[in-house]
Design a protein with these regions (language model features):
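A conserved beta-turn-beta hairpin within the catalytic core of GNAT-like acetyltransferases
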Residues: 131-143, 153, 201
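A short beta-loop-alpha structural element at the N-terminal edge
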Residues: 66-81
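Conserved active-site alpha-helix within GNAT-family acetyltransferase domains
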Residues: 171, 175, 181-205
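Conserved RNA-binding domains used in RNP assembly and mRNA/RNA metabolism
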Residues: 1-65
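Conserved beta-strand in the GNAT
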Residues: 115, 121-131, 142, 147
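Conserved acetyl-CoA-binding loop-helix of GNAT-fold acetyltransferases
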Residues: 145-148, 154-167, 179
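Conserved glycine-rich acetyl-CoA-binding loop
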Residues: 136, 149-160, 172, 189
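Active-site rim helix/loop that mediates acceptor-substrate recognition in acyltransferases
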Residues: 86-118, 127
Length: 223
């Protein structure tokens, strides 16, 4: 019985027999894969660089039904992710393809792209780029293309995604992010503060928000 498979693409907290506790986006590997890779015929869970075989785990706490991943760590899905953003925002496919390609394998810096996955399906995503098509080049970098599929709205997915992105960028040394939007009252829920009105490249004024963060993300060892 593959009792750990249900935790694939979720966010969990794992307690180990060593007494250590880890939390983060979780992926499941089957016994056949682990036999080939590690000569251990057991199922396992992965959080970032950490691997937990079933015998290592004393407790699993499900934190969220979905998981957030940086696209830089998921190069095999780059075309699927590119198409997902293109279909939501109708910006030319090649523009997304070029930006997403630039982030692959990059452990720091801009651009970065992120997706939220539930049951092997992308349900939300956003990016971090230098400038989201506005005149204030000094307000950088910018969170852009924030989108949650309609079936998954009002479930905390947007806040989950935004916090992950802010924490991940802070771990890279980028603790201040900006976001251009026409929404009022939405981003304030997640710790963003209104900064100023900014004119976009289309000549229209939009609201600029700022978020400051010093936390770290990813797989976290909780001692």
């Amino acid at each position: 019985m593959r009792k750990l498979a249900k935790y694939h693409n979720t966010t969990v907290r794992i307690a180990c027999i060593s007494g250590e506790t880890f939390a983060g986006a979780c992926e499941w590997d089957d016994p056949e894969y682990n036999l080939h890779e590690y000569n251990v015929e057991k199922e396992s869970l992965r959080i970032g660089e950490y691997i937990f075989f079933e015998d290592d785990i004393t407790k699993i706490e499900l934190l969220r039904k979905e998981a957030c991943f940086p696209v830089r760590d998921w190069p095999e899905a780059k075309e699927e992710i590119t198409l997902w953003f293109h279909e939501r925002w109708h910006i030319p496919l090649e523009a997304y393809r070029e930006s997403i390609r630039a982030c692959l394998g990059e452990e720091s810096g801009v651009p970065q792209w992120y997706v939220v996955v539930r049951k092997n399906k992308i349900i939300a995503g956003c990016g971090v780029i230098e400038n989201d098509f506005h005149e204030r080049k000094d307000l950088t970098p910018n969170v852009c293309a924030v989108y949650v599929d309609k079936a998954y709205r009002n479930q905390g997915v947007a806040g989950f995604l935004l916090q992950y992105v802010c924490d991940d960028m802070a771990a890279m040394g980028v603790d201040t992010l900006y976001l251009l939007t026409d929404h009022t009252g939405f981003y304030e829920r997640y710790g963003w503060q209104f900064c100023c009105m900014v004119r976009g490249n289309d000549g229209e004024l939009s609201r600029m928000y700022v978020h400051k963060n010093t936390a770290a993300s990813g797989a976290r060892r909780l001692l």
